[in-house]
Design a protein with these regions (language model features):
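A Lys-centered signature of the CheY-like receiver
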Residues: 8, 105
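Two-component/phosphorelay signaling modules centered on CheY-like receiver
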Residues: 10-32
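Acidic catalytic/metal-coordinating carboxylates
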Residues: 36-39, 62-65
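Active-site beta3 strand of CheY-like receiver
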Residues: 47-53
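Receiver (REC) domain active-site loop signature in two-component systems and cognate sites
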Residues: 58
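C-terminal output helix
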Residues: 107-116
Length: 123
């Protein structure tokens, strides 16, 4: 299963990538890293990820807009929101739009692994 990581923080992109690659999540491979929604849509069209981790607060195209664009492109993409957003209304909006799960920053490696496996239907 291919994973696209979308977050404007290089530190978070690297951490999620490390958790996936070194954390024993078998069957998930990295499809790409994007620092904003526009990059995410471009990379998704080229790599066709099955799973996406999505920050909600990003420049240029935020996570809500990106979720809508990705699901228009491929309604089967499984999205896990990973955000420090304190406004729960936006997180609920993301879930209503089709995101399958939410992990609040800061997160533990184990919390992220379990959420990814759940969203990817691999648990």
């Amino acid at each position: 299963m291919r994973l696209l990581i979308v977050d404007d923080s290089n530190m978070i992109r690297t951490r999620i990538s490390r958790v996936v690659q070194n954390g024993g999540i078998k069957g998930i491979v990295l499809a790409g890293l994007a620092k904003n929604g526009h990059e995410a849509v471009r990379i998704a069209r080229a790599t066709r990820p099955e799973v996406v981790t999505m920050d909600l607060t990003m420049p240029e195209m935020d996570g809500i807009e990106c979720i809508q664009a990705l699901l228009r492109f491929d309604p089967t993409i499984k999205i896990l929101v990973v955000s420090a957003l304190s406004d729960k209304t936006t997180a609920i909006q993301a879930l209503k739009l089709g995101a399958r799960g939410f992990v609040a920053k800061p997160f533990s490696d184990e919390e992220l692994q379990i959420a990814l496996l759940d969203v990817a239907d691999m648990r």
